[in-house]
Amino acid sequence: MTAQVLDGKATAAAIREELKERVAALRARGVVPGLGTILVGDDPGSHAYVRGKHRDCAEVGIASIRKDLPADATQADVEAAVAELNADPACTGFIVQLPLPRGLDENRVLEKIDPAKDADGLHPSNLGKLVLMEEAPLPCTPRGIVELLNRYGVSLRGAEVVVVGRGVTVGRPLGLLLTRRSENATVTLCHTGTRDLAAHTRRADIVVAAAGVPGLITKDMVSPGAVVLDVGVTRTEKGLVGDVAPDVAEVAGYLSPNPGGVGPMTRAMLLTNVVEAAERSLS
């Protein structure tokens, strides 16, 4: 068996085409969605991510607002940039590119974001609304995972899903998304401290690997025909490495690779959050 690839690049491209039409409709009504970014420091990876986000904006017609701060920016400098974007009517939503340089309090910065402009869906208020199943911007990577599965016709209703990773950006909120009535999956949240991880993953219909441990999920840990999504990212001397070993493709029914799987979907959902915020402003 060779797994069918869940192609995040192609799916994200299709979503951007759909967003072009929605943005054109907004512009026709005098509303220009704007995405802001706050980037602190000189990390090449962070700069590449931000450039990619603004390329996406240009493609679909979303205005770009960049605030680049030096590596020695203080906590007050970063919070001032957040306050400026909170107050800027041209900014529909914005993100603070993480990680921030050492010495800066990321949580405090994120808490300063206006929840209505939280394009990443990671403000504590919005995560709380997700728990309460109230409408709010959704975390981009978990939303991208669900959207990718839906677009390939992978049924979530009643599915046994094992999520490996307990981070705030993926693991924890993904479980909340998957257990909504609209998805109705049954979720087991595992992590690097889980005893006999393979026993959990082998019984899963869907495995989402988001622990940040290279090669954590191997083919003997996956049931034949299961759906596997590789979301973990670790920087090594050889480049970015995911959590799923290459041999998993021999047994899985579907595989979302890394790179090229969930990453492009995360960026597409960022744009979607901004467009939806602009649409809400008209209602």
UniProtKB/Swiss-Prot annotation:
Instruction: Indicate the family of this protein.
Output: Belongs to the tetrahydrofolate dehydrogenase/cyclohydrolase family.
Q: Name one GO biological process term.
A: L-histidine biosynthetic process
> Which residues bind NADP(+) per the record?
165-167, 192, 233
Asked if the keyword Nuclease belongs to this entry, the reply reads no
Its recorded reaction(s) are:
(6R)-5,10-methylene-5,6,7,8-tetrahydrofolate + NADP(+) = (6R)-5,10-methenyltetrahydrofolate + NADPH; (6R)-5,10-methenyltetrahydrofolate + H2O = (6R)-10-formyltetrahydrofolate + H(+)
What assembly does the database describe for this protein?
Homodimer.
GO molecular function terms attached to this record: methenyltetrahydrofolate cyclohydrolase activity; methylenetetrahydrofolate dehydrogenase (NADP+) activity
Provide the E.C. number(s) assigned to this enzyme. 1.5.1.5, 3.5.4.9
Lineage of the source organism?
Bacteria, Bacillati, Actinomycetota, Actinomycetes, Streptosporangiales
The protein depicted here goes by the name: Bifunctional protein FolD
What NCBIfam families has UniProt attached to this entry?
Answer: PRK14193.1
Q: Which InterPro entries match?
A: Aminoacid_DH-like_N_sf, NAD(P)-bd_dom_sf, THF_DH/CycHdrlase, THF_DH/CycHdrlase_cat_dom, THF_DH/CycHdrlase_NAD-bd_dom
Q: In which pathway does it act?
A: One-carbon metabolism; tetrahydrofolate interconversion
Gene name, please? folD
**What's this chain's function?**
Catalyzes the oxidation of 5,10-methylenetetrahydrofolate to 5,10-methenyltetrahydrofolate and then the hydrolysis of 5,10-methenyltetrahydrofolate to 10-formyltetrahydrofolate.
Q: Which HAMAP family match?
A: THF_DHG_CYH (MF_01576)
Its keywords, alphabetically, are: Amino-acid biosynthesis, Histidine biosynthesis, Hydrolase, Methionine biosynthesis, Multifunctional enzyme, NADP, One-carbon metabolism, Oxidoreductase, Purine biosynthesis
One Gene Ontology CC term in the entry? cytosol
Entry keyword annotation includes Signal: no
